[in-house]
């Protein structure tokens, strides 16, 4: 449908998109095989879950066919553990570099300011770590404390200050 109607951009906004290898490969192969030369597909991915086969396929794609958003959030190991995420930073770094070296895929990496255990010094390190990967775009977001979320439950322990109304920053 999207390809037939030449929709300019389609976004897959599930950061676990590439957790299931066969699922991600099937979608990426389909997109590559049915490329209309116009539509761009935006994928949120966990870069450390990419493997050689996925990276080879991505590197074969037409420039502009897909773009990757990689939610690093922080490189502070205490912060990553506390927000209940996993990330192997060296694999992220390696995979971002392998994709970048081909030059056909736009990559943007995300950081979030205001996370637990992140102070100005550790945030500066996270920024420097991500900046050193030379993404096409470095996106900075602010922690959003949503009603009913783990962060809201832990607001006193983390001494979080935020708005109770959208955008909850």
Protein language model regions, located:
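Conserved SAM/AdoMet-binding glycine-rich loop
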Residues: 1-109, 113-115
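Short, hinge-like loop/turn segments at secondary-structure boundaries
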Residues: 28-29, 126, 155-158
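Flexible glycine/acidic-rich beta-alpha junction loops that bind and position SAM and/or redox cofactors
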Residues: 21-22, 72, 78-83, 113-121, ...
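Catalytic cores of alpha/beta
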Residues: 53-58, 116-134
